[in-house]
């Protein structure tokens, strides 16, 4: 699948390029050129790691399905203590989706535990070896989740900025 810039629809890149670059050269965001149709009923039968891999595979078509399955299984199995996407029964047919089972107890762990693996693989897919610096500005739990996710990732450093006051 190709991704295009929100500021130049003629600028198209692969998913690896979009992930490795972050923002387009003209400052736009990369968005998918289409939204794949998925069989929701089939997804309901999957555990969270398999569901995540199945959905992501539709968008990151230049990544191997085996890599995506392993990355999702490792991320949402270990870091989430087996409770990723846990639906806690409330009453009758009512459930609550618990999003705090990640390593920093922030819902942002869902993205920020997987994204470092995707970035490293994107750079590998593209033959890029330069160091990547991730800059994060936040006033909340995004910083801790990002720091935890990118901790000890080879070829990647991260700096988090918090406002004062």
Across the structure, where does each feature detected by a protein language model lie?
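PLP-dependent amino-acid enzyme catalytic core
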Residues: 1-165
